[in-house]
Amino acid sequence: EERPEDPAALARFQTLMGELAGAPDAEAAGEDQGELALLEDDPEEVFGRFADAVPRTGEGGAAGIGDTFGRLWDGAKEALRQLTYFEMKKRAGVVGKQGLGPLLGRIHQADPELRIHLLGHSFGARLVSFALAGLPDGAGSPVKSLYLLQGAFSHFAFADALPMDRSRSGALKGM
């Protein structure tokens, strides 16, 4: 396991994280600002905050000094885990809006009497919610019920106006 004691290596790791994640989800930007901070703030500060959030054992000996760079690399690993969460959120929204939503529209067009009921948990809740945003305009929604369990998104996703920026709305406003 390579953990160089070099701030430039931490910065490079943060850059690579950004390349893995691609661009943040502009549509869902109102939900959290954490993804941008994770990729744009000072890497030592970001990774330090993540390291502080995870308990460590057996560090520092009698002086309690510990391994500063080891701690920051532990934080970097936690930051990468968080980034994978953001990436999965983005993916679920894209699949819902660009995949499931249009598919439900085609099913409805083929059989307008069919009643569709959707259920989703965690990222699945996000997927089925964004499917509503991906339904074709016009013919009315074929979805008769939507049940969300512990959805992987903020309730602000449905807001007409975001509390932190009243000029913006949630990505699922009006759903």
Which positions does each model-derived feature cover?
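Non-catalytic, alpha-helical, charged scaffold/linker segments
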Residues: 1-70, 74
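Serine-dependent carboxylesterase/thioesterase catalytic core
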Residues: 1, 55-175
